[in-house]
C-alpha cells in the first residue's frame, strides 16, 4: 500500500496529462506532492528527508515549467532526482564511510561487507543510468512517450532491477539452519 501511496503524484500526473496537457499535469503533480507530504506529516508528525527533497525538486522544476511555460524543466526532474540518489549513495561512502543501502536494510538482511558495498554501488549505478535514460527519452521521443516512460518504463525497470537484486542477494544470504 505504501508503494501506491508513494506513486500517488506520478499516477495523478499521468492521468492529468492524458486528460489535459503537460502543464496541467505538472500543476497536479505539484499539488499532489504537497498533499502527500501534508498527509504524511499529519499521520506521523515526521517526513523523511527524501520526501522533502522530492517536494523541493517538483516545486522548483515544476514551478519553472509552469512559470516559463517550458516542458523541458519537468522532463529534467526525474533525472535530477535519480542523480541526487546516486550522488547520495556514492557520497555517503566516499565522504562519511557510511553505506546508505546497508543503513536502510541491515535490520532485515544480513550480508557480508563486500556484498553491501557492491549493492550500494549497483544502486548508485542504476540511478545514474536511469537519469541518463530519462534524458534520452525526453529528448529523443515525444512528450507523450516520455510521460508513458515516466510511469511504465521507469517503474518496470525499477521492478526488474529489484528482482535481479533479490536473486543476486539470495546467493549471499546465510542459510537458516533449523534442527
UniProtKB/Swiss-Prot annotation:
The answer to whether the entry has keyword Transmembrane helix is yes
Q: Which residues cross the membrane?
A: 3-23, 24-44, 49-69, 76-96, 121-141, 149-169
- Function summary: Plays a role in cell envelope biogenesis, maintenance of cell envelope integrity and membrane homeostasis.
Q: How does the entry describe its membrane topology?
A: Multi-pass membrane protein
Q: HAMAP family, alphabetically? A: YciB (MF_00189)
Indicate where this protein resides in the cell.
Answer: Cell inner membrane
- NCBIfam families xref list: ispZ, PRK00259.1-2, PRK00259.1-3
Signal peptide span: none
**Would the keyword Transmembrane be found if you checked this record's keyword annotation?**
yes
What is this protein called in UniProt?
A: Inner membrane-spanning protein YciB
Q: Which family does it belong to?
A: Belongs to the YciB family.
Task: List keywords of the entry alphabetically.
Answer: Cell inner membrane, Cell membrane, Membrane, Transmembrane, Transmembrane helix
Spell out the GO cellular component terms annotated for this protein, sorted alphabetically and separated by semicolons. plasma membrane
What the entry lists under InterPro entries is as follows: YciB
Amino acid at each position: 500500500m505504501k508503494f501506491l501511496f508513494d506513486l500517488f503524484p506520478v499516477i495523478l500526473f499521468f492521468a492529468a496529462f492524458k486528460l489535459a496537457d503537460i502543464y496541467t499535469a505538472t500543476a497536479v503533480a505539484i499539488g499532489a506532492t504537497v498533499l502527500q507530504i501534508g498527509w504524511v506529516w499529519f499521520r506521523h508528525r515526521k517526513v523523511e528527508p527524501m520526501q522533502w527533497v522530492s517536494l523541493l525538486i517538483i516545486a522548483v522544476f515544476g514551478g519553472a515549467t509552469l512559470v516559463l511555460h517550458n516542458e523541458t524543466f519537468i522532463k529534467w526532474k526525474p533525472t535530477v532526482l535519480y542523480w541526487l540518489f546516486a550522488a547520495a549513495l556514492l557520497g555517503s561512502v566516499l565522504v562519511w564511510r557510511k553505506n546508505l543501502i546497508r543503513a536502510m536494510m541491515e535490520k532485515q538482511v544480513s550480508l557480508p561487507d563486500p556484498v553491501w558495498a557492491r549493492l550500494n554501488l549497483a544502486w548508485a549505478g542504476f540511478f545514474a543510468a536511469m537519469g541518463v535514460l530519462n534524458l534520452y527519452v525526453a529528448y529523443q521521443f515525444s512528450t507523450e512517450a516520455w510521460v508513458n516512460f515516466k510511469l511504465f518504463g521507469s517503474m518496470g525497470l525499477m521492478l526488474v532491477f529489484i528482482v535481479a537484486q533479490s536473486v543476486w542477494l539470495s546467493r549471499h544470504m546465510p542459510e537458516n539452519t533449523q534442527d
